[in-house]
């Protein structure tokens, strides 16, 4: 019996090793669950509580009312309008509902964006360290993630100077995260503007992973 042939672009993607850590900690947690020192999880980006009651009630109500069919490909219009309103009230940013697409999480959104915007061989500049899956999304689009080392003094974020120094004829854009996983740091707003201005001047794209935006607190 012959083995199924896996596409080369899939073979380039490395395992997500944090899940192995999660398995090991879950096993240890079961051992100490009823002891005087239960485990506090700090290993994976998932809270130890469930969805708020309002969310649970809304989900149950949608099922009860039969709202379980296909939506528009871009998501529920009413939800897109509410998200547009949230950007207006939270950031005073005018983001029209027509520019909003609902996906099954940030990973799906980033992967779709990469598939839509990155050609084979395109380079995407990213800080190192950064969330491993983000560079895999670039690889899935047959692009090349260029990891630029960062330091604690730089808050593990890219600067405009570093982006300009690393930019080549093959560069397509940057993929940033703020707040970042795994470092938890945010990029300074003015630095982000400088990066975007430079990338835009080169005809490039600025992708930003903001999955932890709601966990950002001003001093």
Language model segments and positions:
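Helix C-cap/helix->beta junction micro-motif
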Residues: 28, 141, 201-202
